[in-house]
C-alpha cells in the first residue's frame, strides 16, 4: 500500500535528500492527507483523483494561502505520485496534468520624485571628479532608464549633445535612441571637462574607471547603493531601482505604455505593463478632482 513513509524513505536513501527537505515533503503531504481524510474516512492515496487535488488547491487559495505555497505543495504531490507510478502503487498519476495558480511578480521598487529631487540637488554633491562622475551616473539612469550593462557599455561618441540624444546598445546588440534633457546634458559636460584632465582622457569609453577602461558592474552598483541610501529607505538600492523610477515617472507624467516600451528597450509589451501599477497615485488624483462625491 502506498504511504508517505515509503516515499520519504525513497527521498532519503535513493535521492540522498537532506533531512530538512524530507521534513518539508512530509509536512506538505500531511496537509493534503488531512484535507482528504476530512472528506472521506475511507481515504487511501490510491483513491485520489485530479478533481480532489484541484479542489484542495482551491481550498488553500480560499483560505488565504499564497500562490507560492500552493505551488510548492502541488509540486510535492506531483513528485509523490511520480514515485507511486514508477513503483506501480498506482496505475495513473492524478497530479500530472494539474497546474498551480500563477504567481504574481513582485512590484518594482522606485524612488519618489521628491527623493530624486533631493538626490540630484547640486548642493548635495562635491565638485571633484568622483562626485561629478557619480552624480552623472545617477542622472544617466534616471533620465534614460537604461540598464546597468548598457550604461557601462557607453562610449563618448554615443552621446549627441546637439540633438540631446544617446545611442544605447541593449540586449542582443539591439540599438535604440533615447532623448535626454538639459540636466543630463550639463552633468555630462561637467563630467567630460574633468575627465579631459585625466591621463586616460583619450579613451573612447564614456564612464572611465579610476585606472582607465570601463567601470565594472560592482563599481557602479556601489556608487548607486551608497547615494540612494542618502535619500531613501528602500531595502533594495540598485541601478535597476533607478530604471524603475524612470519608468514610474514617465507613466505618472502621461507617457504611453508603447512609448515607454521603446524607451526601455523591452521586446514585449507585457514586460512594460508591470509598471502600470505605479500610476495609481495619478488615478487617485484624477478621481479626487473629477468624482462629485470624492
Regions picked out by a protein language model, each given a short descriptive name:
Residues 1-294:
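Conserved catalytic core of the tyrosine transesterase superfamily
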Amino acid at each position: 500500500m502506498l504511504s508517505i513513509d515509503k516515499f520519504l524513505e525513497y527521498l532519503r536513501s535513493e535521492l540522498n535528500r537532506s533531512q530538512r527537505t524530507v521534513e518539508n515533503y512530509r509536512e506538505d503531504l500531511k496537509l493534503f492527507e488531512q484535507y482528504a481524510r476530512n472528506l472521506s474516512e475511507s481515504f487511501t492515496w490510491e483513491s485520489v483523483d485530479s478533481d480532489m487535488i484541484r479542489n484542495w488547491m482551491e481550498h488553500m487559495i480560499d483560505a488565504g494561502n499564497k500562490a507560492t505555497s500552493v505551488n510548492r505543495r502541488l509540486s510535492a504531490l506531483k513528485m509523490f505520485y511520480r514515485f507511486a507510478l514508477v513503483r506501480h502503487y498506482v496505475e495513473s498519476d492524478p497530479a500530472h496534468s494539474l497546474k498551480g495558480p500563477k504567481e504574481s511578480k513582485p512590484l518594482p521598487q522606485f524612488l519618489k520624485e521628491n527623493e530624486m529631487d533631493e538626490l540630484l540637488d547640486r548642493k548635495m554633491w562635491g565638485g571633484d571628479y568622483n562626485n561629478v562622475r557619480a552624480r552623472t551616473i545617477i542622472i544617466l539612469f534616471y533620465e534614460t532608464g537604461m540598464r546597468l550593462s548598457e550604461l557601462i557599455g557607453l562610449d563618448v561618441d554615443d552621446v549627441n549633445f546637439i540633438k540631446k540624444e544617446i545611442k544605447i546598445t541593449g540586449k542582443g546588440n539591439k540599438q535604440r535612441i533615447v532623448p535626454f534633457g538639459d540636466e543630463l546634458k550639463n552633468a555630462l559636460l561637467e563630467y567630460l571637462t574633468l575627465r579631459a584632465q585625466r591621463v586616460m582622457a583619450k579613451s573612447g569609453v564614456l564612464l572611465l574607471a579610476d585606472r582607465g577602461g570601463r567601470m565594472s558592474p560592482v563599481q557602479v552598483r556601489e556608487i548607486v547603493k551608497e547615494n540612494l541610501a542618502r535619500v531613501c529607505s528602500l531595502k533594495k538600492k540598485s541601478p535597476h531601482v533607478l530604471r524603475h523610477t524612470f519608468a514610474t515617472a514617465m507613466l505618472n507624467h502621461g507617457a504611453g505604455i508603447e512609448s515607454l516600451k521603446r524607451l526601455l528597450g523591452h521586446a514585449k509589451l507585457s514586460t512594460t505593463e508591470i509598471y502600470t501599477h505605479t500610476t495609481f497615485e495619478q488615478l487617485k488624483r484624477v478621481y479626487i478632482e473629477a468624482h462629485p462625491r470624492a
